[in-house]
Amino acid sequence: MRSDVIKKGLERAPHRSLLKALGITDDEMRRPFIGIVSSWNEIIPGHVHLDKVVEAVKAGVRMAGGVPFVFPTIGICDGIAMDHRGMKFSLPSRELIADSIEIVASGFPFDGLVFVPNCDKITPGMMMAMGRLNIPSVLISGGPMLAGRYNGRDIDLITVFEAVGGYKVGKVDEETLKAIEDLACPGAGSCAGLFTANTMNSLAEALGIAPRGNGTVPAVHAKRLRMAKEAGILVVELVKRDIKPRDIVTLDSFMNAVMVDLATGGSTNTVLHLKAIAESFGIDFDIKLFDELSRKIPHICNISPVGPYHIQDLDDAGGIYAVMKRLQENGLLKEDVMTIYLRKIGDLVREAKILNEDVIRPFDNPYHKEGGLGILFGNLAPEGAVAKLSGVPEKMMHHVGPAVVFEDGEEATKAILSGKIKKGDVVVIRYEGPKGGPGMREMLSPTSAIVGMGLAEDVALITDGRFSGGSHGAVIGHVSPEAAEGGPIGIVKDGDLIEIDFEKRTLNLLISDEEFERRMKEFTPLVKEVDSDYLRRYAFFVQSASKGATFRKP
């Protein structure tokens, strides 16, 4: 066993002595040592219950004959970090999470690992660490929050953000806003729609590294604790058989994950995260795969923020394995990839049942004929940009409008809420990329303001920043190269016409080639002052969004 390096031989008496200080017995020294990394804390709603999930994992490890050891990592709630300096640290925290786990699991040679995350950057950060370390591993998340209820309908955090915009234009009164605020988030779990956290936890199932139900079983259901025990049992079996993450996760696994992402209409952030995770697993993954597959995979699940359903409804309908059953029915699922169950995913999916034909529609009756995400290219995005196609209003699928340019998200939000943005405008927010922010903040407030102000069917927004999984509308993020790296988004001027064609996947600045070249030659990127040592280092090392916003290799 990997842990024998600290357990066996006379020379390891000091190591055993320290382990015995923890209460470890001689009998336990002969068993597999299982590390359990948890992002439990008392400030994130998605994490506040992870201590209970961890206790269930520990029970499962012991049931299977292993010895559990819990260690922590950090986490940030993007909702609480929104609209202030804290959002600059959200995406950068992903790299710290992966690094910190790699450090601990290298300093202590565990035989296996169980990863217990739940929210936006924590799940991908842990998956990156899993790929780097390549130790027998299972991921079990904390699960989604239940939707809130107000006035006879399900609501969630995005309802609150959009109600703020509604209040500004007199569509929502203060009493209603307060009621929505009080009821939207009823308890523990990752926010209830198909936002980034729930998308990533769902894709962990599709990759074969998490138990069935990982992405959809509600946080407060007892089934979540039973799944956590199962995760503890499974990891010990993987250790005994020496089955590592890279034995399970292949390019075909990523293709399954992308197809699930497209079919469900997942978060645009998955493009960033899957690219980064694939790199950690040593897999060459081109983001163009999203666009190639989106032409084949229809959008079949209408889940918040683009539809009326929530994650609990998807769970009731059969969950992610039922979505994969639709892929299997149409001959698209890569069936031969392995899973933590030591069974091929095709065999497991055959056992799944689709329990609601509207929540998980058949391919011949989709919500949209193409997948939920698209990659756009053009003179404004030579390395690509990302859009949530499932959230684009039909009348905005092709749009030409004048640019209204902002150098950060706050100024854009103020302009939108004060009525300065008119129908037909294209809001351009730049210097919000990985390097330029730094930190590639989410532009949830400006997009929610557009919706709340009643402009969602008339105004587009493009940015080198990113979006919350809760953003929807004619919005395009991850424009690459970013302005801070000399990208063409930096040469856009107020009043310039911008053409967006979601059908053709193009994003272009409508000026002459000569004018374009002249501006690019004269362009000097704005350099912002950065008041954080970590963010200065992050900005120095981070790569483009098209490369997953990972660090450059030394």
UniProtKB/Swiss-Prot annotation:
InterPro entries assigned: Dihydro-acid_dehy_C, DihydroxyA_deHydtase, DiOHA_6PGluconate_deHydtase_CS, ILV_EDD_C, ILV_EDD_N, IlvD/EDD_N
A Pfam family per the record: ILV_EDD_C
GO function terms (MF aspect): 2 iron, 2 sulfur cluster binding; dihydroxy-acid dehydratase activity; magnesium ion binding
Entry's EC annotation: 4.2.1.9
N6-carboxylysine: residues carrying this PTM: K121
Presence of keyword Metal-binding: yes
Active site: S468
Gene Ontology CC annotation, any one: cytosol
Reactions that this protein is recorded to catalyse: (2R)-2,3-dihydroxy-3-methylbutanoate = 3-methyl-2-oxobutanoate + H2O; (2R,3R)-2,3-dihydroxy-3-methylpentanoate = (S)-3-methyl-2-oxopentanoate + H2O
Cofactor: [2Fe-2S] cluster; Mg(2+)
Record family assignment: Belongs to the IlvD/Edd family.
Biological function: Functions in the biosynthesis of branched-chain amino acids. Catalyzes the dehydration of (2R,3R)-2,3-dihydroxy-3-methylpentanoate (2,3-dihydroxy-3-methylvalerate) into 2-oxo-3-methylpentanoate (2-oxo-3-methylvalerate) and of (2R)-2,3-dihydroxy-3-methylbutanoate (2,3-dihydroxyisovalerate) into 2-oxo-3-methylbutanoate (2-oxoisovalerate), the penultimate precursor to L-isoleucine and L-valine, respectively.
Protein's recorded name: Dihydroxy-acid dehydratase
Species of provenance: Thermotoga sp. (strain RQ2)
